[in-house]
Regions:
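Ankyrin-repeat-protein effector appendages
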Residues: 4-11, 15, 185, 196-257
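Start-of-repeat signature of ankyrin repeats
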Residues: 12, 56, 91-92, 127, ...
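Ankyrin repeat A-helix N-terminal signature
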Residues: 18-23, 62-69, 98-105, 133-140, ...
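Conserved ankyrin/ankyrin-like repeat signature
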Residues: 27, 71-72, 107-108, 142-143, ...
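Ankyrin repeat domain, specifically the short helix-to-loop turn at the C-terminus of the second helix
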Residues: 30-46, 74-84, 110-120, 145-155, ...
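Ankyrin-repeat boundary/linker signal
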Residues: 42-45, 52, 87-89, 122-123, ...
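Tandem repeat protein-protein interaction scaffolds
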Residues: 93, 98-102, 106-107, 111-116, ...
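N-terminal segments that cap or nucleate solenoid repeat domains
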Residues: 2-66, 72
């Protein structure tokens, strides 16, 4: 699911959610200073996802959805430290999931990871990690680097349909540098299939992003190199024992002579 512009919330007393909805960040900071408890209050946001799906959220979820600046995120965390660990009700996503889904500034992602690094390991109701959403929304390379540095094993984790972050990246389109980051993290993912049998190459072939053609070419070359390397290793494994046996034979002959 992707983020949509959500409608006005139905909580008349929730001043902070209203201010966040209007992206009035100066007033948001003032409200947090005057009434820090507002950061702990949940509100029902109609159309929070895709403009259709309603969810019960905290102010920090709202702020991440609207790409709030780092200062706002840090203030909300200080007002309610546990809030960064809480999940919205529709898809059980943390603030980091939502920030990656909306292509939030790298400064915001850095703050979220700093305060709650474990969020990089949390799967939502669809089995997706924050990195799945980062790969789906063409985030800056720095965001992908940060997520991989914090949790390298994320490259090996599939969602409920068996999609690794690489499958998502290939389907939606990323730069070759980002593609290399994912492959370097988990080389075997190049040949990993989704539950329905799609390889990363097949996902790239179905894509229509501006990176489409170069991604397909890169993956084809990468797979060929991998296959050749495997053949070379097999040839070496076969050749090496034979060479040793030949050496032993010549030594035995020499000893008898």
């Amino acid at each position: 699911q992707t983020m949509g512009i959500f409608r006005q919330n139905n909580c008349a007393s929730a001043a902070l959610p209203d201010l966040i909805s209007h992206e009035d960040w100066k007033l948001v900071l003032m409200e947090c200073k005057m009434c820090p408890r507002d950061a702990t209050k949940w509100s029902v946001q109609v159309g929070f996802f895709d403009g259709e799906i309603t969810s019960k959220v905290l102010p920090i979820h709202q702020a991440c959805a609207l790409m709030a600046p780092r200062e706002v995120i840090e203030t909300l965390v200080k007002c309610y430290p546990q809030g960064i660990k809480m999940k919205e009700s529709a898809f059980h996503r943390t603030a980091l999931h939502i920030a990656c889904q909306t292509n939030a500034p790298i400064e915001t992602i850095e703050a979220l990871v700093h305060f709650y690094p474990e969020a990089t390991r949390i799967q939502d109701a669809l089995g997706r990690l924050p990195i799945h959403y980062a790969c789906a929304h063409e985030v800056p390379s720095s965001t992908l680097e940060l997520l991989l540095r914090e949790f390298p094993e994320s490259c090996k984790i599939g969602d409920q349909n068996g999609w690794l972050p690489l499958h998502v990246a290939c389907r939606r389109g990323v730069s070759l540098y980002e593609l290399e980051l994912l492959l370097d993290c988990y080389p075997q993912s190049a040949n990993t299939l989704t539950d329905k049998g799609s390889s990363p190459l097949m996902c790239a072939q179905k894509g229509n992003s501006r990176h489409h053609e170069e991604m397909v070419q890169y993956l084809e070359d990468y797979i060929k190199r991998s296959e050749q390397n495997e053949k070379d290793l097999l040839s070496f494994d076969t050749w090496e024992p034979a060479r040793k046996l030949s050496t032993i034979h010549h030594r035995n002959v020499a000893a008898k002579g």
